């Protein structure tokens, strides 16, 4: 079950929106409602970018259109494992010190409804195994967040995607290292 809807039919200022993650279908929203949603999206993404910069997290990349932050599995996990490495815990501590205040504030202000932690793998190995590994890794990160920030426990969802949505290099070939990742995404509140 996915708690968010990708809607690529909404128009903002006459331009087609990017894959916007919201907790409802935005196709029936008024222009004013869409404008407010876009303002919320911009405010949260800008807040996260500023917080990441302050924490020295230049490697944290946020997709402003979807609210997705991508993390490097090579830092978080050993090969073929779902247990956080010590380096991964240190990275998450630094990441969460920047992420949580911004997202908690956005939740309190009614801008964000959900945090989705998604795991991905490369295409090496069995598809069913990869799906299970991606779910376990996403769950491990979600559990780590909940342990440090129990106030977020009720807004975190976990999704394993296995080898879906592979990252491709410049030649159109799979970038296996980049494909092995965990992403954290905020979902905009529409109601």
Residue ranges and their predicted role:
Residues 3-7, 12-13, 78, 100, ...:
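Compositionally biased, intrinsically disordered low-complexity regions enriched in proline and serine
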Residues 23, 30-38, 75-89, 127-131:
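Second-shell loop/turn segments in exported
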Residues 67-68, 166:
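A short acidic, often aromatic-flanked loop/helix-cap motif at beta-alpha or helix-coil junctions
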Residues 41-63, 77, 81-118, 146-148, ...:
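Periplasmic peptidoglycan-binding/anchoring modules of Gram-negative envelope and division proteins
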Residues 61-63, 69, 109, 151, ...:
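Extracellular/periplasmic catalytic domains that process cell-envelope and extracellular macromolecules
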Residues 82-89, 113-191:
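Periplasmic OmpA-like peptidoglycan-binding domain that tethers envelope proteins to the cell wall
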Residues 1-66:
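N-terminal targeting leaders that direct proteins to extracytoplasmic destinations
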């Amino acid at each position: 079950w996915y708690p968010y809807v990708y809607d690529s039919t909404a128009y903002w200022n006459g331009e087609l929106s990017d894959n916007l993650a919201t907790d409802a279908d935005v196709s029936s929203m008024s222009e004013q409602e869409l404008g407010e949603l876009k303002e919320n999206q911009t405010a949260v993404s800008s807040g996260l970018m500023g917080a990441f910069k302050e924490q020295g997290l230049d490697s944290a990349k946020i997709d402003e259109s979807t609210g997705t932050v991508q993390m490097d599995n090579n830092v978080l996990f050993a090969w073929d494992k779902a247990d956080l490495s010590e380096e991964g815990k240190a990275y998450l501590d630094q990441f969460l010190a920047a992420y949580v205040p911004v997202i908690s504030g956005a939740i309190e202000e009614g801008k964000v409804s959900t945090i989705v932690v998604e795991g991905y793998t490369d295409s090496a190995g069995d598809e069913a195994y990869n799906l299970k590994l991606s779910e376990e890794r996403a769950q491990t990160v979600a559990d780590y967040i909940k342990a440090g920030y129990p106030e977020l426990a009720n807004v975190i969802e976990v999704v394993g995607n296995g080898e879906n949505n592979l990252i491709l290099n410049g030649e159109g070939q799979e970038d296996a290292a980049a494909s092995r990742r965990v992403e954290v995404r905020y979902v905009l509140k529409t109601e």
